Amino acid sequence: THGGFMDSHILRKAAARLPAVADLAVLRFNFRGVTSPRGASDGAFGDGIEERHDLAAAMEFVAQRSLPEPWLLGWSFGTEVVLKWGLEHPIAGAILLSPLLHRASAADLVAWAGSGIPLVAIIPEFDDYLRPAEARERFAVVPDVQLVAVDGAKHLWVGEKLTRRV
């Protein structure tokens, strides 16, 4: 992500816990130009446009392994990539954690409205970029979106209690 990476506390813990508790496979990856504790990815930040290819490569990996019913999860900048490019892939649903709605357009949102693909947006009460009231307004064009406002939470989901909620 731009500003985050696959080894963040939320994504690392989800990847460790979900296979055991929900029988799910988890694939984490960094977008181009991101440095994390596991190293640096190739390329440079593409402002949500070039990252389309990173998502496509990840989905190709999923398809090659015949993993059933893939869901996308994006956090912060990752939500922009999911909203803009996720519908190009055979997915079962998408989860948006702390969505920004800076790069995703109204047209991107409208595309999800007619897709029949479940969309869940998890909105922190005290988010720095998009709070629950504004999220309800902005996502109104997607009637089937499941908006989940989380009391007391902030954009980065700091603390074990909030990490577990996510």
Residue positions per predicted region:
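Active-site nucleophile loop of the alpha/beta-hydrolase fold
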Residues: 96-104, 124-126
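Serine-hydrolase catalytic machinery in alpha/beta-hydrolase-like enzymes
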Residues: 1-67
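Short beta-strand immediately N-terminal to the catalytic nucleophile in serine-hydrolase-like folds
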Residues: 69-74, 97
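Conserved alpha/beta-hydrolase "acid-adjacent" motif
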Residues: 128-134
